[in-house]
Amino acid sequence: MTAHRRVAITGIGMVTPVGHDAPTTWANLLAGRSGAGLIQNFDASGFTTRIGAEVKNFHAESIIEDRRLLKFASRSHRFALAAGEEALRDAGIRPENSTRQRWGFKIGRASCRERV
């Protein structure tokens, strides 16, 4: 059995239907705001429901400086990259080659429909 190592959550980042960052998301949740509405990201007429919680008006280019990362990134990958960047900033971590083996990411997501 391997020994358990302690970890610390040092930064949080979010891209959600109620906010494009953690503070906005949290404030909107506390205020009881919902991100649900009519689906606009794709034609949902063939589905039994036309209601979803989509991330709207999100532009990863305003957060991610390295355009090469975004060139081939899907929409959901852009969410993850932006949330990761926010988490790093929140933690005050600037990854360098000498420290990259000492930190990691845990990324969670709900359902995202990919478009080709």
Show which residues each predicted segment covers:
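Conserved "HGTGT" condensation-loop signature of ketosynthase/thiolase-family condensing enzymes
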Residues: M1-R113
